[in-house]
Amino acid sequence: MSGIEEKCNESSYSADSIKVLKGLEAVRKRPGMYIGDVGDGSGLHHMIYEVVDNSIDEALAGYCDLIRVTLNKNGSVTVSDNGRGIPVEIHEEEGISAAEVIMTQLHAGGKFDQHSYKISGGLHGVGVSVVNALSEWLELRIWRNNKEYFIRFNNGITEAPLSIVKENIDKKGTEVTFFPSVGIFTNIEFDFVTIEHRLRELAFLNSGVKILLIDNRFEEVKKVEFFYTGGIEAYVQYIDRAKHAIHPCIVVNTEHVESGISLELAIHWNDSYHENILCFTNNIRQRDGGTHLSAFKSAITRVITSYLDTTGLNKKTKHDFSGEDTREGICCVLSVKVPDPKFSSQTKDKLVSSEVRPVVENAVYTKVLEWFEEHPIEAKAIIAKIMEAANAREAARKARELTRRKSALEVSNLPGKLADCHAKDPAISELFIVEGDSAGGTAKQGRDSKIQAILPLRGKILNVERARFDKMLSSEQIGTLITALGISVEREFSLEKLRYHKVIIMTDADVDGSHIRTLLLTFFYRHMPELINKGYLYIAQPPLYKVKSGASELYLKNEQALQNYLIKSTINDTKLILDGQEQLIGYNLEDLINKVVQFNCLLDRASKKFNRSITEILAINDLFNKKIFEPESGSRLQKALDVLNNLEESPDKTNLQVLKHENRIEFFHFSRGLKNTKILLKEQLELFEFVEISQFALSIFDIFSKRLKLIVKGKEFDVVTPSQLLNTIIECGKKGITIQRFKGLGEMNSDQLWDTTLDPTKRTLLQVRVSEVDEAEGIFSTLMGDVVEPRRLFIQANALNVMNLDI
């Protein structure tokens, strides 16, 4: 550095250079430090959690048993509870109400006073004030002293002091409504499932507290109630619902008086090969564990060692067991309440309070060992499970050593099937995992060999959910994949030697391709989770259609994209004549067609519950509601059915007749002497899907109540229903073009595969992410495990949602 540069730096660095961010300005300047990532949605949802945590703290103190979270139509969120209500008195030091202090100043609140809250997860005045700072507006209502108080903030700034808006109110509690700042968050749309997961978690951890989640954003109001009296024991049973437990739950509930630390523990071993331990401190999840997790692991190992020594079972073991062996198949929820917890970061993902370790370790060791001694039969089953794990680990070790010795003698240890790339930098290298040699050959020809490697997998891929670790290592396909990636798995897992930073699963669009993709995802989730956590795992999105018009070609991802293309290709040459006079063209016609497309989607969704053609004709005549049961609707109903009977392409063109009863309507026709009947129940008309169809039909009712003539490229068509209109336009759009549907990757040539799926500048990739670990755990166990009942229930619950089934 030159002398001039030194002088410049010295002169510019003075007292004036030190900027002090006052009030909540610091939060708005660096929101990520306080609320988490503002781009990926985690920080946005943390806004809700911060407010809910304060209500939970009221519950922990014994003053609250009902919490309500409402997602409002305008995009705001309301969180209310029936606790004591935030204090409203004037704060002596600040000269404003305590409520305003809490909402506008960091590090101000009741959690710093040990008399107000013995245990707390969030900090009033840190959490809530941050929410206020990061909201476009926030409204606070407090019910306290038989009065209702109100105050509103804009971007964290008080509009007017706290005021009394109602008196003689027999109610206590707090209600916070906030609208996230568009300038802070990339996306301000809340995800119902993400919130549902966290609230369910809190309900399990706080037995006896009822939490309501209400979503008012859509026409169908969604409401979920969480209330569990079984506590964390019920939580473990919920997490492990798709596995076989080998013994009843072990429950530990104790408090260390001197430190004020309390412990709740529910644990059982199941017949799976994976451990699942959830750790919480003051209701906050620690994804990276901490001192409580270390203490638990140490205590469990000590319990098993001590029990083996006491009973003499250690003499029967073939191999020494490790800590990992003791936790194979374990499912545990560990919850500690700590008066003044210390975490490694603002996100509280790791507990570092050293005083927690001895309390947890001693309590777990004492209570679990006591349970083992009182339940010798169950204890013996657990020991057998652990010894089996030790034997499998030893077998896996020998298999690895054999593989290493074999590899050391070979010039190259890369699998022969792998067509590797020339690049040695993992950051730019990609590995495509493809199904079979046929697709593999095409992919090898079409790839960019500089950065893209191709690995074809042939034969049946092992379902690792049902296989031991040693059996998995002996699988040819899994072994080939592990070798190609350059890394080992499980205990030896490290991403340092990973040869590709994009691992892309590329399978066919049929049922076999979906199955292979699921098996591969199961392997990566179970044995290479860091690959997913780092964002290295992707799923390719090959097109389903190729459209050729003259010399031009276009690839389309799915059925919806094809439909949109066909509509757009004809819209400029299309007009709709209403009652022989008025005509719809251009934007107005496009708007109608968009509505018809939406209407068709609603009909498709409801078609599993009632006949589609009848639903449509009733809806566009304003009869797919309770009006159909009114006596005066008879003539309109018969007229609608006459229209349906006369439609040329109607599958129900068999002289459909109707018979009305008090609470049901029978639609019937005779075919080959047999009576075919479809029954519409009065109560069915209250189903959300049916109400949605009825209401949406009103937006196109005026159009379809007229006589319609569709003109496409000079050709005229009489149309009556929305489906007829849409199908006519689509069929006209197909004329003069060639549409090819790809069933598998092998049907494409190398150039097509490059243009659609391999070319980094044109392709679409789906990145695999796991947002909620225990929910993912449940899904993989349900779909890929060996317990049939949860899978049967899952299929029954979701079967009607399947639109296209490949069988």
Curated annotation (Swiss-Prot):
List the PROSITE patterns hit by this protein, alphabetically: TOPOISOMERASE_II (PS00177), TOPRIM (PS50880)
Feature type site, description Interaction with DNA: K460, N463
Molecular function GO labels:
ATP binding; DNA binding; DNA topoisomerase type II (double strand cut, ATP-hydrolyzing) activity; metal ion binding
Q: Which GO terms describe its cellular component?
A: chromosome; cytoplasm
Residues that, per the record, bind Mg(2+) 1: E435, D508
Name this protein carries in UniProt: DNA gyrase subunit B
Its function, per the record, reads: A type II topoisomerase that negatively supercoils closed circular double-stranded (ds) DNA in an ATP-dependent manner to modulate DNA topology and maintain chromosomes in an underwound state. Negative supercoiling favors strand separation, and DNA replication, transcription, recombination and repair, all of which involve strand separation. Also able to catalyze the interconversion of other topological isomers of dsDNA rings, including catenanes and knotted rings. Type II topoisomerases break and join 2 DNA strands simultaneously in an ATP-dependent manner.
Q: What are the leading ranks of the lineage?
A: Bacteria, Pseudomonadati, Pseudomonadota, Alphaproteobacteria, Rickettsiales
Catalysed reaction, written as an equation: ATP-dependent breakage, passage and rejoining of double-stranded DNA
Q: What else is known?
A: Few gyrases are as efficient as E.coli at forming negative supercoils. Not all organisms have 2 type II topoisomerases; in organisms with a single type II topoisomerase this enzyme also has to decatenate newly replicated chromosomes.
